């Protein structure tokens, strides 16, 4: 056995290994918490000074991770956040949890991963384990990261260790957390796999070792493409059934009674979050290298991307029946987070809906108990809004109220009672109300 592997493996099992997490967002911070709870000392790295300062003051900027969960670890000095990346040298394991978005042409943007890898390479030492958790296309770890990390003369699998283990974070999920969700792990070599598997097995309920980093990278893509294409299917069925006067939600509920061969997926105003709207296009891009066109995956993406336009059209039809157009109409959007009971706005369909309404001349406001303000979006640089109070008067004054996110705290019966027109994209309101349309 490689002596460096033996030494690090012992440090991990003895909970003496120092863990560094790069990227303290919706993936990185839950991972930090998971390692802290299992007794490891963790340093969080981020370029955002505001996040670092808040964490070091015992405050949290993610609603489902409370300050009370972090403060005990600060007092024992087992956790610290920093913008000083020179401290990476002190880490035994470095876990990368940075964004992997798409560029303006919907091609993979690996700039965050590559910049982080360059930074790690500048501080890499013998005996370290580097793991990428960010979702990406097959080959990123060995084609993109490996040459950068080996540039200084150290050899992966001999002098340092490299692995890929895809994050499976589901923000705000009260049941499945970083700790009780199985972890897929793929290593560049057998020693790389063994170390990464040892590390995560200290923290998660179960590890799932696979044969390579590419197999691990592909696993995450399969998971999210599976969801994307099935959501696209029910979104298309929603539009078809609507024309036939059939309630797609009733149909899905009835089909769910079949105990085998069926898994329910639900339509909505479009996909949101950092994974499902983005990840399929990573495989689409990579597939071109092997001369393959991912028609099925791309079609699903087109359907899901079109859903905000469907919501807009349904709203316009309902307003037209009342002799109104979008221009000058007051529209209240309920929920700007991409799903209920969280504060995550990434890729939220609400943002697209608001943008489309504004372009058509509507006076748009939003309410979201989890998101007090919305600004700084890459795709919508001019958007800067603050959540307005949800009152009976505001509901009555709105020409249309769009339920874009079905937060549990919303009293939908009260909303329907006070609103002139409700456009329900989440099946939040029972059928039968004359002022409610499904979209």
At which residue positions do the language-model features occur?
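Structural/interface elements that position substrates and couple domains in central-metabolism enzymes
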Residues: 1-439
């Amino acid at each position: 056995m490689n002596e460096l592997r033996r030494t690090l493996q012992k440090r991990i099992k003895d909970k003496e290994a120092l863990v560094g997490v790069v990227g303290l967002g919706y993936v990185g911070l839950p991972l930090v918490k998971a390692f802290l709870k299992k007794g490891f000392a963790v340093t969080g790295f981020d370029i955002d000074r505001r996040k670092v300062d808040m964490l070091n003051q015992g405050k949290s900027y993610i609603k489902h991770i409370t300050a009370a969960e972090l403060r005990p670890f600060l007092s024992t000095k087992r956790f610290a956040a920093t913008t000083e990346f020179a401290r990476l040298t002190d880490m035994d394991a470095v876990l990368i949890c940075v964004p992997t978005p798409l560029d303006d042409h919907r091609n993979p943007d690996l700039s965050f991963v590559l910049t982080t890898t360059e930074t790690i390479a500048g501080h890499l030492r013998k005996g370290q384990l580097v793991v990428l958790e960010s979702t990406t296309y097959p080959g990123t770890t060995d084609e993109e990261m490996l040459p950068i990390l080996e540039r200084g003369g150290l050899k992966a699998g001999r002098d340092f260790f490299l692995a890929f283990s895809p994050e499976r974070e589901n923000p705000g999920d009260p049941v499945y957390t970083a700790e009780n969700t199985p972890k897929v792990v793929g290593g560049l070599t057998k020693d790389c796999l063994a170390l990464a598997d040892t590390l995560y097995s200290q923290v998660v309920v179960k590890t799932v070792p696979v044969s390579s980093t590419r197999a691990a990278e592909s696993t995450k893509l399969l998971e999210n493409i599976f969801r994307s294409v099935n959501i696209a299917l029910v979104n298309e069925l929603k539009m078809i059934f609507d024309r036939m006067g059939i309630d797609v939600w009733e149909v899905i509920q009835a089909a769910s009674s079949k105990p085998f061969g069926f898994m329910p997926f639900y339509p909505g105003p479009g996909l949101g979050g950092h994974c499902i709207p983005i990840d399929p296009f990573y495989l689409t891009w990579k597939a071109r290298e092997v001369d393959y066109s991912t028609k099925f995956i791309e079609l699903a993406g087109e359907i899901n991307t079109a859903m905000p336009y469907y919501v807009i059209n349904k709203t316009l039809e309902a307003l037209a029946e009342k002799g109104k157009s979008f221009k000058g109409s007051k529209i209240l959007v309920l929920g700007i987070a991409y799903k209920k009971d969280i504060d995550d706005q990434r890729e939220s369909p609400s943002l697209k809906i608001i943008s489309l309404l504004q372009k058509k001349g509507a006076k748009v406001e939003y309410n979201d108990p989890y998101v007090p303000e919305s600004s700084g979006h890459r795709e919508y640089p001019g958007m800067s809004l603050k959540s307005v109070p949800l009152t009976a008067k505001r509901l009555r004054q709105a020409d249309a109220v769009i339920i874009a996110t079905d937060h549990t705290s919303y009293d939908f019966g009260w909303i329907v009672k006070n609103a002139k027109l409700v456009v329900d994209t989440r099946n939040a309101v029972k059928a039968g109300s004359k002022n409610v349309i499904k979209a």
